[in-house]
Amino acid sequence: MAKFKFKKGDTVEIIAGDDRGTKATVLAVLPKKNKVIVEGCKIVKKAIKPTEENTKGGHLNKEMPIDVSNVRKVEA
């Protein structure tokens, strides 16, 4: 397995996609999938069904993984 150059907490810049130019923090690293989850980028709405804890249900905004080729590490 190749060495991964990103760690949780690193500051990165999105270099491709809808969030191009955004600088944010890495929340999680997924080395097997070759992806990272970046705070506030690639947000999708997930529908939540009503449950006993959440009787209303509704929508949840969630960050989705971004391929590492679309992310560049920024020296702080």
UniProtKB/Swiss-Prot annotation:
- Which is one Pfam family of this protein? KOW
> What keywords is this UniProt entry annotated with?
Ribonucleoprotein, Ribosomal protein, RNA-binding, rRNA-binding
Which PROSITE patterns does this chain map to?
Answer: RIBOSOMAL_L24
Q: Name one GO biological process term.
A: translation
Instruction: Give the family per the record.
Output: Belongs to the universal ribosomal protein uL24 family.
Question: What is said about its interaction partners and assembly?
Answer: Part of the 50S ribosomal subunit.
| HAMAP family registered for this protein in UniProt | Ribosomal_uL24_B
The UniProt function text for this chain reads: One of two assembly initiator proteins, it binds directly to the 5'-end of the 23S rRNA, where it nucleates assembly of the 50S subunit. One of the proteins that surrounds the polypeptide exit tunnel on the outside of the subunit.
Q: What is this protein called?
A: Large ribosomal subunit protein uL24
Q: Could you tell me which species this protein originates from?
A: Sulfurimonas denitrificans (strain ATCC 33889 / DSM 1251) (Thiomicrospira denitrificans (strain ATCC 33889 / DSM 1251))
